[in-house]
A protein has these predicted regions:
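Bacterial N-terminal signal peptides that target proteins for export
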Residues: 1-11
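C-terminal region of N-terminal signal peptides and the immediate post-cleavage residues
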Residues: 8, 18-35
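Repetitive helical segments and hydrophobic/amphipathic motifs
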Residues: 14-15
Length: 475
C-alpha cells in the first residue's frame, strides 16, 4: 500500500487531487453563446462518456481560454474532469480574466488517444457556449504535458500557444522503450521471474519485483545492479523534493534515492500498468532488438555512479553488461508500435510559441525528455518557437503555483510581444517570490509545505532511446 500512497502523492504533485472539483452533470441544451463571466461553471458529458469542466472568471472575460490536460490516472481510479493543476493557479487565472477548461478523458491509464479528441471536443463545447476564444492556450502536466504537445501537433489551428509541464516529450514509443530497458536489466540481473512484456498477472508481477528489489537493496552487489537499472533509464539520484540534491560523488545516497524511485513510483508503471498499455495498443509496442547496453550506459548521466558502486561491490560491470547484451531480446508488435506512435510521437512541427518546464530531479519522466523534444523541433527548423525552463527540485511535476504562474507570464509575454523575453533564473525566482507565500508551496506526501522558487540553468543529457516522426514515421 505504501507505493499506492506514493503514487497518490505523485498525482497530487501532477495536479490531480490538490483541490475538489465541481460535480459532473449533463451536456447543456444548445443555446446562443452566453457571456463567459460571473463565475459561470459548465460541466457535462461528451459523446464518448468523458466529462468536461469549464469555469469563467467573475469579471469580464479577456477572450483567452486555458485548456488543461491532466496527467496519468491509475487504471480504474476515479477520473473527474479537471481544468487546472491546483486551486491557487486556477484562482490566479480566473482573477486575471482567463477562462479555464478541461476534460476527464474517456478512459484511465494510457489515455492519449481519447484525451486528444476529448480535449478538442471540450474546446468545441466552449465555442458553442461562449463563442470562440481569441486565443486558446494548451497546457498540462505529465501525461497531460504529452497531450498538450500532441494537441498543438495534431490540431495546430485551434491553439495560440502551449505550456507542457513535466511532459512525456520523448513520445510514447521512446518512453516505453526506455522503460523496457530498465525492466529488462532488472529481469536479467535481479529477478528472472518478473515479466517485462505480455504481463499476465500485473499485481503479482509488481509484488515479485518489489520483493526482489528490496532484497537486492540489502547487499552491495544488489545496490550496484539497482544503480545500473536506474542508469539505463537515466533515473536521477534525487528523490525528496524538500531535500537538497546529493553531492555529485555521494553515490550511496544517489542509489538509495533511485531505489525509492523504483519502489514508490516507477515499478508500478513498468511491472503493472504496462499491461493496460498493451491492452489498448493491441500488443507489445516496445523492443530492445539491436540495443547495445554498454553503449547506452556510456551515455547515461549516471555512469560515474554505476562504475563506483560496481567497484565497491567487487562486481564486474563488463560481465553484467555482457549478460545484458547476450540475453534473448524482445521484439515489438508492429501494429502496437503504430498505435503508440500515433498516440503519440512527435515530428517537431510546432507552429505556436511553446514553453516547457521540468524539474531536474524527476525520476518518472526524466528531464532528458526535454532534450528529445528540443532535438526534433530544432531538426524541423522550428526551434525559435520553443523555450525550455528547469526547476532545481526533486520530484515529478513538483512545481509551486508561483513557478507555474511565472512560466505562464513568460508565455503570455511572448504572445503579446511576438518575441521571447525569458528572464534569467534569478529574475524568474524573484518574480515567483513576489507572488507571496500562498503561491510558494508544493505538496509532499499529501502535505502542503513552503517552497522557495527554484528556477535554474540546466542542460539535460541526450535521451537514451530516441524515437520520433521526423520526417516520416519509420516503424
Amino acid at each position: 500500500m505504501a507505493r499506492m500512497k506514493r503514487l497518490a502523492g505523485m498525482a497530487l504533485a501532477a495536479g490531480l487531487v490538490i483541490g475538489g472539483l465541481a460535480a459532473v452533470g449533463t451536456v447543456p441544451a444548445a443555446a446562443a453563446p452566453a457571456t463567459c463571466s460571473g463565475s459561470k461553471t459548465l460541466n457535462g458529458t461528451l459523446a464518448d462518456g468523458s466529462t468536461y469542466l469549464i469555469q469563467c472568471p467573475a469579471g469580464a472575460w479577456n477572450g483567452t481560454l486555458f485548456l488543461y490536460s491532466h496527467g496519468y490516472v491509475v487504471p480504474g481510479e476515479a477520473n473527474p474532469a479537471q481544468d487546472g493543476t491546483d486551486p491557487v493557479t486556477e484562482g490566479w487565472l480566473l482573477d486575471n480574466g482567463y477562462a479555464i477548461a478541461g476534460s476527464s478523458y474517456a478512459i484511465t491509464g494510457w489515455a492519449v488517444k481519447s484525451a486528444l479528441t476529448d480535449q478538442v471536443a471540450t474546446v468545441n463545447v466552449f465555442d458553442q457556449s461562449f463563442g470562440r476564444p481569441s486565443h486558446t492556450i494548451a497546457w498540462g502536466v505529465s501525461l497531460g504535458g504529452m497531450i498538450t504537445a500532441g494537441l498543438i501537433q495534431d490540431y495546430p489551428s485551434l491553439f495560440s500557444a502551449a505550456l507542457p509541464l513535466c511532459g512525456v516529450l520523448s513520445g510514447g514509443v521512446a518512453t516505453w522503450n526506455t522503460a523496457l530497458d530498465g525492466a529488462f536489466a532488472f529481469q536479467q540481473l535481479i529477478d528472472p521471474s518478473v515479466q517485462v512484456v505480455h504481463i499476465t498477472d500485473p499485481t503479482g508481477n509488481l509484488t515479485s519485483g518489489e520483493e526482489a528489489v528490496t532484497a537486492a537493496q540489502a547487499t552491495p552487489q544488489g545496490r550496484a545492479r539497482i544503480a545500473l537499472v536506474a542508469a539505463l533509464d537515466d533515473t536521477p539520484g534525487w528523490f525528496n523534493p524538500t531535500s537538497p540534491e546529493p553531492a555529485s560523488t555521494d553515490y550511496a545516497t544517489q542509489e538509495q534515492n533511485q531505489f525509492d524511485w523504483d519502489t514508490q513510483v516507477t515499478f508500478p508503471f513498468v511491472l503493472d500498468f504496462r499491461a493496460q498499455l498493451e491492452a489498448v495498443a493491441g500488443g507489445n509496442p516496445s523492443w530492445n532488438t539491436g540495443v547495445n547496453y554498454a553503449a547506452d550506459l556510456a551515455k547515461s548521466a549516471d555512469l560515474a555512479e554505476v562504475k563506483a558502486l560496481y567497484k565497491a561491490a567487487g562486481l564486474s560491470l563488463s560481465k553484467d553488461l555482457q549478460t545484458l547484451n547476450s540475453a534473448k531480446r524482445i521484439s515489438a508488435n508492429p501494429l502496437a508500435v503504430t498505435y503508440l506512435a500515433q498516440n503519440i510521437a512527435y515530428n517537431g512541427e510546432i507552429s505556436v510559441p511553446t514553453l516547457t518546464v521540468h524539474t531536474i530531479g524527476d525520476g518518472l519522466v526524466v528531464p532528458e525528455n526535454e532534450q528529445a523534444y528540443r532535438a526534433v523541433v530544432d531538426r524541423d527548423g522550428r526551434g525559435a518557437l520553443l523555450q525550455q525552463l528547469f526547476v532545481s527540485r526533486a520530484g515529478h511535476c513538483e512545481f509551486s503555483p508561483a513557478e507555474i504562474v511565472t512560466a505562464m507570464q513568460v508565455l503570455l509575454n511572448r504572445m503579446s510581444t511576438g518575441h521571447w523575453n525569458v528572464p534569467s533564473p534569478a529574475d524568474l525566482n524573484k518574480d515567483a517570490a513576489e507572488l507571496g507565500p500562498s503561491f510558494n508551496i508544493i505538496s509532499v506526501n499529501n502535505a502542503v509545505v513552503p517552497a522557495t522558487p527554484a528556477y535554474a540553468d540546466f542542460s539535460p543529457t541526450r535521451y537514451l532511446r530516441p524515437f520520433d516522426l521526423f520526417p516520416f514515421p519509420i516503424l
